[in-house]
Amino acid sequence: MADNKKIIEGLQIIVTDLAQQADGHAIQSKIFAAQGFSKLGEKYAEHAAEERGYVDKCIDRILDLGGEVKNEAKKEAPVYTDVIEWIKYDLQVSKDCLAWLKDLTEEARDDYTTYDILKEYYQDEEEDMYWAEQQLELIEKIGLQNWLNHQI
């Protein structure tokens, strides 16, 4: 049987960390759009909105499980003007998250509702990781300037 306390704690970590990631993606969206890379700006704006949706689902699930949602302080996160540095940073965040998230998803296997939420979030985070890896490979193949031209 799933350990609700451990699951609630895990969901709270997601709420706190993912809210910060959503804010970070929103900030990066504005920075890239201001640099003239509207497609990249739109991608990260959409990503921020998607992450906020997962935050909402996790908050709802904490409440459904009888937990108390906390509005915890968020760690300071870097802001980048260099696209490559940002993608590398974001890729590492995804990689770090996936190992931990896999364990939490396994912990929730008997709580089908939480399991489904975590599985969906895991799949989304995995797609983000693959996208970042593909973009870095593409930049290496066609060059940064050519890649940036596609982001206008």
Where on the chain are the PLM-derived regions?
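Iron-associated oxidoreductase/ferritin-like identity signal
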Residues: 1-152
